[in-house]
């Protein structure tokens, strides 16, 4: 007798709940800003990816409303039929200038970018070297390509060199690509791009950087690749338009030749309706803001350093983060989840992150300070960390 859908779901949902792996989803009442409201109660929000506070920016809201008035609420078709609006062309030209590349292509999400770009270029005759802590969308994009996937120890340049040498010298593959996050989302560490480029040039590797958490944050806002001055050395620059940019979507930036190929061959571009007009115009406005001023970028880093210093002085382990991402590493999964709940009771919303998202025994709460937080908010959060940490005997 085959298993019914109900039996499958009941068994596996119960397993998740019994093992502390079931994710309870909270509904936010209103905007996702530095303060949020859930079930009528206000919280200091340290869980969003809204790094620069642009998700609630008045100029972006005005731009979106104006675009809806002139272009409607939807694009009406896929890009290759008649869903490419002048707004999309303007956005992609702006993104290319922002990233220092010849061209760019916009997608409906950052996840779509990795599903699209990897499988459009790599196939069963190729090999992909992938950092072991890369985002789930990279993992899925690699699987979709059917290329040989070779896991590389996290930011281990000796391991990368050895595996690149082995893959290239084996003669089994037409192309070999190395893929890495620019900024790793769980720990906040930065990819060693100068060393990666050196190894890539030595062995002829294609280079692919997913800068979801670096765009708007690193390189005075232009990203991790710009931070290291390597715009002409990285073949694929990937980014989201939903984190620091504050809206929705993703993009690939690179040579005109690459972008032409993606427009012809990447399936999410070919078979999914393009970004909505309001979103598209708001994104363009956000990118132009970052090109015109570093004010929000600088405020983000100032707030991040303030929070890190406060948590470190209390005795918390904030890991090796080199970016505003600020983990507080607790260790035990159940203790981590209890810690997050107790902080919520004190008015601080910061989610627990445990196995399998991070290795077992490295549970943490991940703080995401933004440019929109005030020092008073951060002081209140630090005070809550002190109170709960002492009550739970963690500090």
UniProtKB/Swiss-Prot annotation:
CDD domains: KBL_like (cd06454)
EC number per UniProt: 2.3.1.-
Binding site for pyridoxal 5'-phosphate: 110-111, 185, 210-213, 240-243
Sample GO molecular function, one term: pyridoxal phosphate binding
SUPFAM superfamilies membership: PLP-dependent transferases
Keyword Transferase: yes
Biological process (GO), any one: biosynthetic process
Modification N6-(pyridoxal phosphate)lysine, positions: 243
UniProt cofactor(s): pyridoxal 5'-phosphate
Assembly description: Homodimer.
UniProt record similarity statement: Belongs to the class-II pyridoxal-phosphate-dependent aminotransferase family.
Xref: PANTHER family: CLASS II AMINOTRANSFERASE/8-AMINO-7-OXONONANOATE SYNTHASE, LD36009P
Protein name in the entry: Putative pyridoxal phosphate-dependent acyltransferase
Native organism: Staphylococcus aureus (strain N315)
